[in-house]
A protein has these predicted regions:
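Short, intrinsically disordered N-terminal pre-domain segments
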Residues: 1-24, 364-367
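A glycine- and small-residue-enriched flexible loop/hinge signal that marks low-structured segments
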Residues: 9, 19, 26-31, 36-38, ...
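N-terminal assembly/attachment segments of tailed bacteriophage virion structural proteins
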Residues: 39-86
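Short loop/turn motifs at secondary-structure junctions
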Residues: 74, 106-108, 320
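Phosphate/oxyanion-binding active-site loops and adjacent basic polyanion-contact surfaces
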Residues: 87-91, 299
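Hydrophobic alpha-helical bundle architecture
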Residues: 290-298
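C-terminal structured domain segments
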Residues: 298-345
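C-terminal edge-of-domain segments
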Residues: 330-367
Length: 367
């Protein structure tokens, strides 16, 4: 019989993080390796998909790098698309093709990225597509830009200076833990963080970044000083970073590019825009079921109850707050014309609970 006692330790290879984060994230960029066809939205669900479809990636390819980073966060519902040419012109031409995702892939992205590209033309194209599909676009201020130059760029009204609820501007680039010379776009980290939030109504504020240990430019970081670089950037509508007491980097700021210092508009919050989009999708789906019904008060009341039920389900998930309302506007409706008019109101969860503001959606159901 064996007489040895003690502890036996065996070394095994580490298992990859399961790709369970299902937020629909679309990445537009360049790729010169793999099997990815140009101008064709393509789904990536697994590590194997990424290896086959994207290959190892060329020196200036943006898609393989971005997908690898998103998969670090467990993202398993990615859409990639490249243009006919591996440059800005090709990328610019590919962005509008995201409108085809619903018909070609059966899904519509909720977050759109275009890593390494942030010209005025690129941002304008992103702005158009996210308005069209009800999503948000994440862009980065160019690597190695100083904090002062980043603040100056935000004063413009184009490119990274655009003021829009659906555009999120990120700064700085992050240094990879294993190779500090390898810079990673903060926007891609943010997309991974959004994919891992409990629901669309949660803010990314203070969520940790994975696999980074520095910024590409020197920055002063603080939770309390109004003169720190991260606070100056946040006041200009830039999503940036901070360091928690453990020294780990976290997202700092949950606002989009339409924010400016002191503004209390609820729609400057990323999660407020995402909540409005999600509730709109749910309301549309329920409204469609009533299109074939006779237009009268009974139908109007049933549809209102359906809206209330929808909001109740989302509040139970803590995606939105309690206190939601669905109002049938009989004075704006026309039974003879088959038109029913409603107002939907709800409040998202805000990082600053002193701001109590609701989001309103106007619904017109017409047969």
């Amino acid at each position: 019989m064996p007489t040895n006692t003690g502890v036996i330790v065996k070394q095994t290879s580490a298992e990859a993080i399961p790709l369970k984060a299902q937020l629909e994230v679309a990445v537009v960029g360049t790729c010169t390796t793999g099997t990815l066809a140009a101008s064709t939205p393509t789904r990536i669900r697994t590590k194997e998909d990424a290896t086959t479809i994207l290959g190892a990636g060329g020196a200036t390819d943006t898609l393989p790098k971005a997908v690898a980073l998103l998969q670090r966060y467990g993202c398993g519902n990615l859409i990639v698309i490249k243009g006919a040419t591996a440059d800005e012109a090709g990328t610019l031409a590919a962005i509008p093709l995201l409108a085809n995702d619903r018909t070609q892939l059966g899904i519509t992205p909720q977050v759109v990225l275009c890593p390494s590209f942030n010209s005025t033309a690129i941002v304008a194209a992103l702005n158009t597509i996210v308005d069209n599909i009800r999503a948000i676009a994440l862009i980065d201020i160019t690597a190695a830009t100083s904090v002062n130059d980043a603040l100056t760029a935000r004063d413009a009204d184009d490119g990274v200076g655009i003021k829009d609820n659906r555009i999120v501007v990120c700064f700085p680039h992050m240094q990879n833990t294993d190779d500090p010379t390898k810079l990673e776009e903060l926007s891609v980290h943010l997309a991974g963080i959004l994919a891992n939030l409990a629901n669309y109504g949660q803010s990314p504020l203070n969520q940790p970044l994975k696999g980074v240990n520095g910024t590409d430019v020197t920055m002063s970081l603080s939770y309390s000083s109004e003169t720190s670089d991260n606070e100056k950037l946040n006041d200009k509508g830039v999503l940036t970073v901070n360091r928690n007491p453990d020294g780990k980097y976290v997202i700092w700021g949950g606002r989009n590019s339409s924010y400016s210092e002191g503004l209390t508009d609820v729609l400057t919050f990323i999660n407020a825009i995402r909540a409005r989009d999600e509730i709109t999708r749910l309301v549309e789906a329920r409204s469609i079921k009533f299109l074939s019904q006779e237009s009268n008060f009974a139908t109007a009341s049933l549809l209102r109850e359906s809206f209330i039920d929808c909001l109740s389900e989302e509040a139970a998930k803590r995606a939105i707050k309690q206190g939601y309302k669905a109002t049938f506007n009989e004075s704006k409706s026309d039974y003879n014309a088959g038109k029913l008019d409603y107002t939907i109101e709800f409040a998202p969860w805000l990082p600053i609970e002193l701001i109590t503001a609701s989001v309103s959606i106007s619904v017109s159901v017409e047969r």
